[in-house]
């Protein structure tokens, strides 16, 4: 296997089919590489960059890279992994969310070598007859091979007809673009294979499918998602970005190195070995935080974020021997006053509320000002009450 293929396989989950990818790379012909993103929220996060980084690798090798904004599919709602019908977005919501994407993706991709497209360009031109012909190219039985659809069907949960259209339209995007390679999350494998199937039907060479692992959020359990509050946005301020990375568990840190870092694999393996032999993983986490912040904000901002982080922790004199407590967060969030009381940091919730109003409670070194604040799942936090009471907590769903 040549060095280019080895580089492209780093961090991938699955390639269908590897021998096809090798032949196309070895042909020397520039390939059309497609990655699609539905504008379900206005901000991209580090989970999205797992795909963007792979797209950038192809871009650096001279291939044509297409960042496809699924403005049409966004109005259907991706049913992947859902046990209920997802609320479709309105046209206004889709347009508003998509506005920020181009600015954000250029923190990773080269603007001059990136083709940004919208799938409404061809889907809006499709007639009712065209759509029916497209629907005729797949069967209900094949759709029910999808794990999420199968579970909902077996459990008597409703599946709307428009949800069956989603994988067909995503697959048709590959036909419209004549994609050679499509990148997607591991949970998108079914949809990407529909693209291969449709390309064959339309007389095209089927695309190679490359799936990437799903990045866990700050809680280390669920997929990184803005709706779950467990995300690190690529537009987050440097201090916030660095602080969030420093809040993740040591185990999750290695996962982030695997999927987000550009550090040489040999170095990461050495750091992992040293930590297993007693080295402090905090130092390795600092390296990760510095690398990520520098990528999106520059070296100066990364240094400043580290200085600010260390100053906050030095001034707060957080004990080194704090034992991490795992706290389950109820639906709707954990009211901070209740949480502080439940951690035995105050004698009552009313005392906690009084201390918040007096500025006597800090979270991760920042003074808490909102007594109605609710903590959501995701990450590890230090809660400080007064000068001497501390708790280290990891919030899970």
From Swiss-Prot:
Please verify whether the record's keywords include Flavoprotein.
no
Keyword vocabulary terms for this entry: Aminoacyl-tRNA synthetase, ATP-binding, Cytoplasm, Ligase, Nucleotide-binding, Protein biosynthesis, RNA-binding
Q: Where in the cell is it found?
A: Cytoplasm
Recorded GO cellular component terms are:
cytosol
List where the motif 'HIGH' region lies.
39-48
MF GO annotations: ATP binding; RNA binding; tyrosine-tRNA ligase activity
Reaction catalysed by this chain?
A: tRNA(Tyr) + L-tyrosine + ATP = L-tyrosyl-tRNA(Tyr) + AMP + diphosphate + H(+)
Q: What broad class of enzyme is this?
A: ligase
**What are the residue boundaries of the S4 RNA-binding domain, all occurrences included?**
334-395
Query: GO terms for biological process?
Result: tyrosyl-tRNA aminoacylation
Please indicate the residue ranges that the annotation assigns to the motif 'KMSKS' region: 223-227
The EC number of this protein is: 6.1.1.1
SUPFAM superfamilies linked: Alpha-L RNA-binding motif, Nucleotidylyl transferase
The UniProt family comment states:
Belongs to the class-I aminoacyl-tRNA synthetase family. TyrS type 2 subfamily.
What is the protein's known function?
Answer: Catalyzes the attachment of tyrosine to tRNA(Tyr) in a two-step reaction: tyrosine is first activated by ATP to form Tyr-AMP and then transferred to the acceptor end of tRNA(Tyr).
Q: What is this protein called?
A: Tyrosine--tRNA ligase
Q: Which organism is it from?
A: Methylococcus capsulatus (strain ATCC 33009 / NCIMB 11132 / Bath)
